[in-house]
Amino acid sequence: MKSTRPFHPTPVITIDGPTASGKGTVAALVAAHLGFHLLDSGALYRLAALASIRYQVEPDDADALASLVDGLHITFREGCAQLDGVDVSDEIRAEAVGNRASAIAVHASVRAALVARQRAFRKTPGLVADGRDMGTVIFPDAVLKVFLTASVEARAARRHKQLMQKGFSANMDNLLQDLRERDARDSNRAAAPLKPAADAKPLDTSALTIEQSVEQVLAWYRELGQPA
């Protein structure tokens, strides 16, 4: 059955979910398949987190953090995340930066400072946006909203593999604890808590390959009458 959601001339597909649910990889592959732009919103928060560490801004100082975010020079070029003109793509994937990103994302002022930057990614021919509030806050008119989930054990295993491949040390027990703490923090924050949009399609990736997850998203997009 085709969706009754109004067609937007610049369509957006949102893929939300918790840390290490596979949303970033799935979003990138869907975007590549469709020839759409890609927004990795988590990278924006990680860049803000890295800046807060560098400039020694405390994670509970909401006003100072919002001011810092407003003045950041952030760019994405050829898949690389740059802070003040320097490629920090690998640095922002460190666990310490990820934990700081989750901590500063609880502040409404920080999230508000990043809203316009995220919405500016919407350009023709379309956008695939991944994050935690893409379908609920940033792009509520998205033509397709997907909410990825996976067991915490599956997510910890994926995260461990990612970190090891990037040359970071990782401990499974610590990763499990960190993921549970992040889930609680992301789901219980007052500003844009992690939750599926009312019209989001749930996709549990625990037992799925990346290819199967991507094909399911594309199948849902085709059901809307869109070429995929």
Curated annotation (Swiss-Prot):
The record's listing under InterPro entries reads: Cytidylate_kin, Cytidylate_kinase_dom, P-loop_NTPase
Any one of the GO BP annotations: nucleobase-containing small molecule interconversion
- Localization, UniProt: Cytoplasm
Instruction: Report the GO terms under cellular component.
Output: cytosol
Q: Which reaction does it catalyse?
A: CMP + ATP = CDP + ADP; dCMP + ATP = dCDP + ADP
Q: Which Pfam families match?
A: Cytidylate_kin
Is-annotated flag, keyword Cell inner membrane? Answer: no
GO MF terms held by the record: ATP binding; CMP kinase activity; dCMP kinase activity
Question: Could you say which residues bind ATP here?
Answer: G17, P18, T19, A20, S21, G22, K23, G24, T25
Where is it predominantly found?
cytoplasm
Q: What is this protein identified as?
A: Cytidylate kinase
Please name the source species: Burkholderia pseudomallei (strain K96243)
What gene name is listed for this protein? Answer: cmk
